[in-house]
Amino acid sequence: MDNRNTQMYTEEEKTVNPFLPSTPGPKKAKGGGEAVETHPAPGPLPPPEVRDIGERREPDRAQQQPQKPAVAAGTQSLGNFRQGFMKCLLEVEKMEASHRRASKARSQTAQKSPRTLTPVPTSAPSLPQTPASVPASGPSWARLPAPGPEPAPMGAPVPTSMPCPVLLGPALDLGWRRMELLHQSSERTLSYAKARQEPEEQSLQKLYQNREKSEEQLTLKQEEAFRSYFEIFNGPGEVDAQSLKNILLLMGFSVTLAQVEDALMSADVNGDGRVDFKDFLAVMTDTRRFFCSVEQNALSDMAPHNPHTLLFEILSLLVEMLALPEAVLEEITNYYQKKLKEGTCKAQEMEAAVGRLRLQKLPYNPQQEESSEVPERKVLSILSRLKQQNYAPNLQSPYAQVPCILLCPQLDKKMVRRQPSNHYALDQCTPPGLDPDIRSPFFQSGSQGNREHNSDSRKWLSSVPARTH
């Protein structure tokens, strides 16, 4: 580097020399002798600024002095002046080079000084990656670690005497984060299963709601038929305890006053303490009560009276006794026949929906299944029992061999001649403890003994065929 500087300055001298001022020649003494210049011993060099100022002043002084003819001694003094100037330049360059080396050494020592590593919280634990080659100007934390023992694996105990460049702060949260990830994954699976289960439950709920809505849809003729049945109780616009007890006694039911009150409380749907026609209609169109009554009649005739189905039992006896007008009988039997068929189809649909849930292996609530399907699930078994009873060889009914279940009674106008109103037969009948076997002939005032009744006459929903016109 010094050689380059010297070459550069020699080239500058070549360009500067033609413009250098002429130096005065040696002075001659008065005695005719030649005066010789004396050079003082070189002392300490002044600073560069002082030298520059002195060099600027020297040419001025040289220009002010009178020029004299140059001689050989002047040429020698010019060479000495050039050599002194080059020495000054070289010394200045050496000082600047040493200056740069010293500052560079200080910067390197400052970079090599140890720094304390502070753990910084990160969003996810990651192992520190050491690059293969890092320049010297990079930060201290990115450089290669000093040669020594290999760093311990993540989470392992590190001795205090050994320097370790690995940050252990994020590694402490690794266990918690694993538990959090497991918890999130379990929540996702549960939410996915729940999301798949909700459409099935909603479909079941909609099916059940549609069934409940269809119960309220009655035609005008059907409503008038149920009103005719309601007027039999002869109450003051409602069914009270006295009227209900009188009808039960006429039908041969032996009930207590507590059972009558329970039946009225069950029929009071709106809870106002009165059983008006609206409550009566809601009870008679209730699908659950209807199927419960059908099941009780199919199982046993000696079953205890159910207060929730007592009105159905009274209606069953009135239909079998032909104690209602012909149009009323036809509308009521057609209504319950349709309800029985719809209940059977809906029970099959409900079973299919539950089967799909089981095939998909999704958890479902069995209690909810029982509460929503108990009446409908037993329809098929009830029908099979009714068929077995109808086809039994010991039955004497002429309708025992009918291959299908029809719910409308056979009304032959030529054989059965009823009076315009047969309520008088109920008014004349007052025996409270009549046997079921003699109950039917007691109400044969208009049929002249042409109809036969047996002990199974209460099963009118399954034993009587439909009317043909």
Swiss-Prot record:
Task: Give the EF-hand domain ranges.
Answer: 255-290
The residues that hold Ca(2+) are 268, 270, 272, 274, 279
Q: Which Gene3D superfamilies match?
A: EF-hand
Q: Which residues form a coiled coil?
A: 198-225
Q: Which residue intervals are annotated with compositional bias (Basic and acidic residues) in the record?
A: 49-61, 450-459
Q: Where is the composition biased (Polar residues)?
A: 105-132
Question: Where do the segments described as Disordered lie?
Answer: 1-76, 99-157, 424-469
Keywords in alphabetical order, please.
Answer: Calcium, Coiled coil, Metal-binding
Biased composition regions of type Pro residues, renumbered to the chain: 146-157
Provide a Gene Ontology MF annotation, just one. Answer: calcium ion binding
**Looking at the record's lineage, which domain of life comes first?**
Eukaryota
Q: Where are the transmembrane segments?
A: none
UniProt lists compositionally biased (Low complexity) regions at 62-73
Q: What does this protein do?
A: Involved in the differentiation of haploid spermatids.
**Know the name of this protein?**
Spermatogenesis-associated protein 21
Annotated organism of origin: Homo sapiens (Human)
